[in-house]
């Protein structure tokens, strides 16, 4: 009866309970549910920011992939470096620090060992430092030269044959030499002969013969000198070796042919006059010969103060006659003048092998006569380095060929020019 007459009253508590239960359940929310809410909010915020970026989705994905790859690569490199350092430290400990030796230590060690070895050698041989210095050095091998000698009694001529050389030392950077031979008689040095230069060889074959006009009655007082040189276009020619043959020791009843070892050359007693460098250029089509006086060096001192006032004269000659004359400016108070002055001569092609260019270096004097320091000539009937220079010019038309020449005594050059008229 009671339940039937008050149905609302019975239902009310149930409703109240139903509404209270959820209310009470939200208050003690679990930690897991709070984290999920925070993550969802962060995710929602990230997505909102992502949508604001003005890039297509595929571009964003590509950027993300590249970033991940960079991070992974950096981590890999760091790990590898750490492992490598540990490995090296371990090896260093095992080897006792051998890797710490640098090149300086190695060189110092080598030097110490070398010094010690020398001391040990001295101890074994029983030689002191003083005794070792006094020990004669082994004679340097300079090669050898084959030559022949004969005398023509009918014409009063000494015939000298330069056949070949062998086992010459290498004086050039390439391990070879450019040898040639000078031949002359002492005490008269005025007449000298030279063979052709043989390029890049230590065993040249010359097969050249030279003739000296000497009466047999005077031959006994002469000494024949044969000297082997290494040719160098831009500096002084180096002498390899020489030997002397006194004529009073030779039996001219038959032809002499023999090998002789080259000896170290004696220092030349002749006074040094200096060297001059000039270039030659010939243009056959225009018939134009150009001589450029470049410079001179180590000239002889002519003035009281130990210097000179040098200038250069150039003569074009043919058959002993002076065809043209030119001269440079004067350089004051110097033994190493620089000129770089050019002079041209008209020489037809058919005459180029008949002319001579005579170059004379003089010391200028305001009051007295200008004294010649030295002289040289190239061209017709020249010999040695001068002939080679002239030949190189003719072999290379239109191209300037520069070369150094050793100045000679004026009287000697004039005598040669007079003979070769």
Curated annotation (Swiss-Prot):
Cofactor(s) named in the record: Ca(2+)
| Binding residues for Ca(2+) 3 | 232, 235-236, 238
List of residues binding Ca(2+) 2 = 171-172, 230, 232, 238
Q: What is the effect of changing residue 303 to G?
A: Fails to relocalize to nerve terminals after stimulation of neurotransmitter release
- The segments annotated as topological domain Cytoplasmic are 80-421
Using the UniProt annotation, give all residue ranges assigned to the region (Disordered).
112-141
Residues carrying Phosphotyrosine: 229
Where, by residue number, does Ca(2+) 1 bind? 172, 178, 230-232
Which tissues does the record link to its expression?
A: Expressed in the brain (at protein level). Predominantly expressed in rostral, phylogenetically younger brain regions, and in some endocrine tissues.
Topological type in the membrane: Single-pass membrane protein
Instruction: Could you list this entry's UniProt keywords, alphabetically sorted.
Output: Calcium, Cytoplasm, Cytoplasmic vesicle, Differentiation, Glycoprotein, Lipoprotein, Membrane, Metal-binding, Palmitate, Phosphoprotein, Repeat, Synapse, Transmembrane, Transmembrane helix
**GO terms for molecular function, please?**
calcium ion binding; calcium ion sensor activity; calcium-dependent phospholipid binding; calcium-dependent protein binding; calmodulin binding; clathrin binding; identical protein binding; lipid binding
Glycosylated positions are 24
Q: What is its main location?
A: membrane
Q: Where is this region: Phospholipid binding?
A: 135-381
* PTM notes: Glycosylated.
The record's family statement is: Belongs to the synaptotagmin family.
Q: Subunit structure, briefly? A: Homotetramer. Heterodimer; heterodimerizes with SYT2 in presence of calcium. Interacts with SCAMP5. Interacts with STON2. Forms a complex with SV2B, syntaxin 1 and SNAP25. Interacts with SV2A, SV2B and SV2C. Interacts with RIMS1. Interacts with PRRT2. Interacts with DNAJC5 in a phosphorylation-dependent manner. Interacts (via N-terminus) with RAB3A. Interacts with SYT12. Interacts with calmodulin. Interacts with DNM1 (via C-terminal proline-rich domain (PRD)); this interaction facilitates vesicle fission during clathrin-mediated endocytosis (CME). (Microbial infection) Interacts with C.botulinum neurotoxin type B (BoNT/B, botB). Has lower affinity for BoNT/B than Syt2; mutating its residues to match those in Syt2 increases its affinity.
Q: What is the name attached to this protein's record?
A: Synaptotagmin-1
Q: What is the lineage of its organism?
A: Eukaryota, Metazoa, Chordata, Craniata, Vertebrata
Gene from which the chain derives: Syt1
């Amino acid at each position: 009866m009671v339940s039937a007459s008050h149905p609302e009253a019975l239902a009310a508590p149930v409703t109240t309970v139903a509404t209270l239960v959820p209310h009470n359940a939200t208050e003690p929310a679990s930690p897991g549910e709070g984290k999920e809410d925070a993550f969802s909010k962060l995710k929602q915020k990230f997505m909102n920011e992502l949508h604001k970026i003005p890039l297509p989705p595929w571009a964003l994905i590509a950027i993300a992939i590249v970033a991940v790859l960079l991070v992974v690569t950096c981590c890999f490199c760091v790990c590898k470096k750490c492992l490598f350092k540990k490995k090296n430290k371990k090896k260093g400990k095992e080897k006792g620090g051998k890797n710490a030796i640098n090149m300086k230590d190695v060189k110092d060690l080598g030097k110490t060992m070398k010094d010690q070895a020398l001391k040990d050698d001295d101890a074994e041989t029983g030689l002191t430092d003083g005794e070792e210095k006094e020990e004669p050095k082994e004679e340097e091998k300079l090669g050898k030269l084959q030559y022949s000698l004969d005398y023509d009694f009918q014409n009063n001529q000494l015939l000298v044959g330069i056949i070949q050389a062998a086992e010459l030392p290498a004086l050039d950077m390439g391990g070879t030499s450019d040898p040639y031979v000078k031949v002359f008689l002492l005490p008269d040095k005025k007449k000298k002969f030279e063979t052709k230069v043989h390029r890049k060889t230590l065993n040249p074959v010359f097969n050249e013969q030279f003739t000296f006009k000497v009466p047999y009655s005077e031959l006994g007082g002469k000494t024949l000198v044969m000297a082997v040189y290494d040719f160098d276009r831009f500096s002084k020619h180096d002498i390899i070796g020489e030997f002397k043959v006194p004529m009073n020791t030779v039996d001219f009843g038959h032809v002499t042919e023999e090998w002789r070892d080259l000896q170290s050359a004696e220092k030349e007693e002749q006074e040094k006059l200096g060297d001059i460098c000039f270039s030659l250029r010939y243009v056959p089509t225009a018939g134009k010969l150009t001589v450029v006086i470049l410079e001179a060096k180590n000239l002889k001192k002519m003035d009281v103060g130990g210097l000179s006032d040098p200038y250069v004269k150039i003569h074009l000659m043919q058959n002993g006659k002076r065809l043209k004359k030119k001269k440079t400016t004067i350089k004051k108070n110097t033994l190493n003048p620089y000129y770089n002055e050019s002079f041209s001569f008209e020489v037809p092609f058919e005459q180029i092998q008949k002319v001579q260019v005579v170059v004379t270096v003089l010391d200028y004097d305001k009051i007295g006569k200008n004294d010649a320091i030295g002289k040289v000539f190239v061209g017709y009937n020249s010999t040695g380095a001068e002939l080679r220079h002239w030949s190189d010019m003719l072999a290379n038309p239109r191209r300037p060929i520069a070369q150094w020449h050793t100045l000679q005594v004026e009287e000697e050059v004039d005598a040669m020019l007079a003979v070769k008229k």
